[in-house]
Amino acid sequence: MNGPHDLGGMMGFGAIAPEANEPLFHAPWEKRAMAISLAMGATRQWNIDMSRHAREKIPPGDYWSLSYYEIWIEGLLRLMNERHMLDGPPKALPRLEAQNVTPVLAKGSAYNRDVAPAPQFKIGDRVRVRNLQPTGHT
């Protein structure tokens, strides 16, 4: 998938100039956006890959006009809409109780996956690559 979220693979944008002493949050609402995203993740209605894909599906014109945390909220809204969580009566979902937030975040979550076949190449092998521009998720 080649889109605005893939700046590392897009031509013509130049180097990213990091903001000196950039704060983690530029405004109070950004803290809440992050907290809501984490809280909704605790409902176990999607995984980290589904969450990332929801953000990657944002149309480029919309994506370019959104800030970092607006992108997270837009992705969250997409996930919730896909699961009909915003219409009809509230559904009973798993919750993360306040006293458990810090230990759960400190523990993190699994992101490793077993790889069934052995890798085809090893470090130092010469390979030939193609510049593909896939339209879907890779």
Which sequence ranges carry the predicted segments?
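N-terminal intrinsically disordered, low-complexity, charge/repeat-rich segments that act as generic
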Residues: M1-L96
